[in-house]
Amino acid sequence: MSTLPPSKMNFSNMNQSIASEGCIITNASISNSIVGVRTTIESGASLNGVICMGADYYETEEQKKLNEEKRLPNLGIGKGAIIKGAIIDKNACIGEGCRIGIDNMSREDGNYGHYHIVNGIIVIPKNTVLYPGTVI
């Protein structure tokens, strides 16, 4: 078992939420949510009613550079992503500007590839990559 530093929250707002150790949250708005260990939430992101399981590791600068070259999102929640009423499993990469569950529409249960609907709740499985601008 490793010991992680306390979460680092820069210019962020948390309301009725909790963040586990090792999170890095920058200029984000989080309400009625649980943020798991080592979660990175980038600038302008908004979470409401979200359970985010976190990550098993931190990405290195080399990994982030490789992601940029391949146009892949980094581990965690990308810039400007808006997520409502969802469960995000470990090691998910949610790209910049993604919109998840923001329309409040009823969804039919099922497996939709990069996500599932279970009892009307959007579930992003472990290790999923959602590219920038994805709308669910």
Where are these regions (language model features)?
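Left-handed beta-helix
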Residues: 1-136
